[in-house]
């Protein structure tokens, strides 16, 4: 029996569907591409505030940029001549899903492979230039990446040019097995021939530079620069900690840590790299 049920002390409101629809219709939608979250300070940033260099205005974190964006920041306008575009990536091991991954990377980046190679001018100084793009299968080094960089050094020897490489990589490309690992030795041999010719080689380490690229040509430059807070190393942090059974410093494998221990010559802000490259190339004989 519900003869003595207490009355509710609140009223019930039935939503007015027509009113609800009109309210939601007037709420402005913010496009996803307008803002970016800084991985370092976690702040939401209006993308236009990042500028062309894509540097966080709050903490100065350097966002990862594409090879084309790097090219725009670095070389004299209209001076870049791309080379070795006809070299095609093969699938010698018939690795499952590799062809699809390659095609997707090409569509995302507009590149044929993980490295952009060519000749360019930087403030009037001619250089042989390679820029690795981490958006292309994490800039992993396969046979084509190794071949393009090797040919770049060979061209630089023939034309008496300095070589400048912006490195970024997750390491050797597992889909190509031992052939990807062989690129470490092949490129290093080309670096040696270039050095024997008395020519200048400059590397700029960007985030991330790891694995086989670090263990070969990334650390073989006559001068090694790095962008602030770039991750640079061979094996991963957790792998090392598990192996040595020790806790590593918080800044371990950061560019600043490597500079303190003599592996990097200087940390250079992204906005100052163009001037620094031109100065170093000119100081070491130039490229005219």
Curated annotation (Swiss-Prot):
<dbReference type="GO" id="GO:0016743">
    <property type="term" value="F:carboxyl- or carbamoyltransferase activity"/>
</dbReference>
<dbReference type="InterPro" id="IPR029045">
    <property type="entry name" value="ClpP/crotonase-like_dom_sf"/>
</dbReference>
<feature type="binding site">
    <location>
        <position position="38"/>
    </location>
    <ligand>
        <name>Zn(2+)</name>
    </ligand>
</feature>
<keyword id="KW-0963">Cytoplasm</keyword>
<dbReference type="InterPro" id="IPR034733">
    <property type="entry name" value="AcCoA_carboxyl_beta"/>
</dbReference>
<dbReference type="Pfam" id="PF01039">
    <property type="entry name" value="Carboxyl_trans"/>
</dbReference>
<keyword id="KW-0863">Zinc-finger</keyword>
<keyword id="KW-0275">Fatty acid biosynthesis</keyword>
<keyword id="KW-0808">Transferase</keyword>
<keyword id="KW-0444">Lipid biosynthesis</keyword>
<comment type="function">
    <text>Component of the acetyl coenzyme A carboxylase (ACC) complex. Biotin carboxylase (BC) catalyzes the carboxylation of biotin on its carrier protein (BCCP) and then the CO(2) group is transferred by the transcarboxylase to acetyl-CoA to form malonyl-CoA.</text>
</comment>
<keyword id="KW-0443">Lipid metabolism</keyword>
<dbReference type="InterPro" id="IPR000438">
    <property type="entry name" value="Acetyl_CoA_COase_Trfase_b_su"/>
</dbReference>
<keyword id="KW-0547">Nucleotide-binding</keyword>
<feature type="zinc finger region" description="C4-type">
    <location>
        <begin position="38"/>
        <end position="59"/>
    </location>
</feature>
<comment type="pathway">
    <text>Lipid metabolism; malonyl-CoA biosynthesis; malonyl-CoA from acetyl-CoA: step 1/1.</text>
</comment>
<feature type="binding site">
    <location>
        <position position="56"/>
    </location>
    <ligand>
        <name>Zn(2+)</name>
    </ligand>
</feature>
<keyword id="KW-0276">Fatty acid metabolism</keyword>
<feature type="binding site">
    <location>
        <position position="59"/>
    </location>
    <ligand>
        <name>Zn(2+)</name>
    </ligand>
</feature>
<keyword id="KW-0862">Zinc</keyword>
<feature type="binding site">
    <location>
        <position position="41"/>
    </location>
    <ligand>
        <name>Zn(2+)</name>
    </ligand>
</feature>
<comment type="subunit">
    <text>Acetyl-CoA carboxylase is a heterohexamer composed of biotin carboxyl carrier protein (AccB), biotin carboxylase (AccC) and two subunits each of ACCase subunit alpha (AccA) and ACCase subunit beta (AccD).</text>
</comment>
<dbReference type="InterPro" id="IPR011762">
    <property type="entry name" value="COA_CT_N"/>
</dbReference>
<dbReference type="GO" id="GO:2001295">
    <property type="term" value="P:malonyl-CoA biosynthetic process"/>
</dbReference>
<comment type="similarity">
    <text>Belongs to the AccD/PCCB family.</text>
</comment>
<dbReference type="GO" id="GO:0009317">
    <property type="term" value="C:acetyl-CoA carboxylase complex"/>
</dbReference>
<dbReference type="GO" id="GO:0006633">
    <property type="term" value="P:fatty acid biosynthetic process"/>
</dbReference>
<protein>
    <recommendedName>
        <fullName>Acetyl-coenzyme A carboxylase carboxyl transferase subunit beta</fullName>
        <ecNumber>2.1.3.15</ecNumber>
    </recommendedName>
</protein>
<dbReference type="GO" id="GO:0005524">
    <property type="term" value="F:ATP binding"/>
</dbReference>
<keyword id="KW-0479">Metal-binding</keyword>
<feature type="domain" description="CoA carboxyltransferase N-terminal">
    <location>
        <begin position="34"/>
        <end position="288"/>
    </location>
</feature>
<dbReference type="GO" id="GO:0003989">
    <property type="term" value="F:acetyl-CoA carboxylase activity"/>
</dbReference>
<keyword id="KW-0067">ATP-binding</keyword>
<dbReference type="GO" id="GO:0008270">
    <property type="term" value="F:zinc ion binding"/>
</dbReference>
């Amino acid at each position: 029996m519900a003869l003595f049920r207490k009355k509710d002390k609140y009223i019930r409101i039935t939503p007015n569907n027509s009113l609800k629809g009109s309210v939601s219709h007037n709420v402005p939608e913010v496009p996803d591409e307008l803002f970016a979250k800084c991985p370092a300070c976690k702040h939401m940033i209006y993308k236009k505030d990042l500028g062309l260099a894509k540097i966080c205005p709050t903490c100065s974190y350097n966002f990862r940029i594409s090879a084309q964006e790097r090219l725009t920041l670095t070389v004299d306008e209209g001076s870049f001549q791309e080379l070795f575009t006809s070299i095609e990536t093969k699938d010698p091991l018939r690795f499952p899903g590799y062809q699809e991954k390659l095609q997707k990377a090409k569509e995302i980046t507009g590149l044929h492979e993980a490295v952009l190679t060519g000749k360019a001018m930087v403030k009037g100084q001619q250089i042989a230039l390679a820029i690795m793009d981490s958006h292309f299968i994490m800039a992993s080094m396969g046979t084509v990446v190794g071949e393009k960089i090797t040919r770049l050094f060979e061209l630089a020897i023939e034309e008496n040019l300095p070589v400048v490489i912006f490195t970024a990589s997750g390491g050797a490309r597992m889909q190509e097995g031992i052939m990807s690992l062989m690129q470490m030795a092949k490129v290093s041999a080309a670096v040696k021939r270039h050095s024997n010719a008395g020519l200048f080689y400059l590397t700029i380490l960007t985030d991330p530079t790891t694995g086989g690229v670090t263990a070969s040509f990334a650390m073989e430059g006559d001068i090694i620069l790095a962008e602030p807070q770039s991750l640079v190393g061979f094996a991963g942090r957790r792998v090392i900690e598990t192996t040595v059974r020790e806790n590593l410093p918080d800044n371990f494998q950061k560019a600043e840590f490597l500079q303190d221990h003599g592996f990097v010559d200087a940390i250079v802000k992204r906005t100052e790299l163009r001037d620094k490259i031109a100065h170093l190339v000119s100081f070491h004989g130039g490229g005219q």
